[in-house]
Amino acid sequence: MKVLVVVQARTGSTRLPGKVLLPVAGAPLLVRMLERVRAASTPTEVVVATTTDAGDQPVRDLARQAGVRCFSGHPTDLLDRHYQAALACGLSPAPASGGGDGDEGDGDVVVKIPSDCPLIDPAVIDRVIGCYLAAPERYDFVSNLHPATYPDGNDVEAMPMAVLAAAWREATRPHEREHTTPFIWDQPERFRLGNVPWETGRDLSMSHRFTVDYPEDYAFVSAVFDALWTGDGTAPSGGFGLNEILDLLAARPDIFELNRRYAGVNWYRNHLGELATVGADQTRRPEEAR
């Protein structure tokens, strides 16, 4: 069994162009993100999945400098990009046991983590992947997003390569291609879904925002790194995780306020009429955020 973490990254963000290249604690945001992904204890291979656009050459260069494999694929069809990246890394789309949906066994595993989550806690990555690996015969998809409870920006989705292949073959609606996995998690009657809630019992998914889409998000992430990053090379994750971030925000409400107005803003808002398992209480529009 291979476990492949696919980190999607590009420079063409409309709200914050080139965000993965912006400096965070003396290195590009993507580098800090990859450090935290690789700090997870679960043995995985990591690949950066960028686009074929010439403007994404800096992403390819950064991945190479970081010692991480890079795949260049479709600019807007993220489902195809993830699938092709996994194929390029040697994963097999065939179910391990030769079955179909619901019988993927211990085949190769794809883990989806977006590159705009530079504060992701390596322990959260381990929890989600560990949930799947503990009983791969039970699940077609495991994430910590359905429903979400962790602060936004700790997104981890794990699935057998065979299930990703089924989505790649069958998904036709634009949002299913753009966002990679809705074809899977929006069909609980077909796919066996697992969710990993925050073990604290808290739900900060709509109140705390650790992802980067807007300039205010970048200011927030920069402030967190400036306050907590050790920079001494002894801790691959920078020496801090989710608990340390929350302690910092409790002590420094000025940092928390930097991007609070965008808490709860996500892509669901544009597809509420198309998503069967997502409600209006799981998203906000930017103009509604305060």
Which stretches of residues belong to each language-model region?
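Acidic metal-phosphate-binding loop of nucleotide-sugar-dependent transferases
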Residues: 75-76, 117-119
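Active-site acidic Asp-centered loop
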Residues: 113-115
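Conserved N-terminal catalytic core of the sugar/cofactor nucleotidyltransferase
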Residues: 31-98, 105-107
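Conserved nucleotide-sugar donor-binding
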Residues: 156-168, 215-219
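Short aromatic/hydrophobic "clamp" motif used to bind/position activated sugar donors
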Residues: 110
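N-terminal glycine-rich phosphate-binding loop and ensuing alpha1 helix
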Residues: 2-50
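Conserved donor-nucleotide/metal-binding helix-loop-beta segment in metal-dependent transferases, i.e.
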Residues: 84, 89-91, 121-149
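Conserved alpha/beta core of the MobA/IspD/sugar-nucleotide pyrophosphorylase nucleotidyltransferase superfamily
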Residues: 181-290
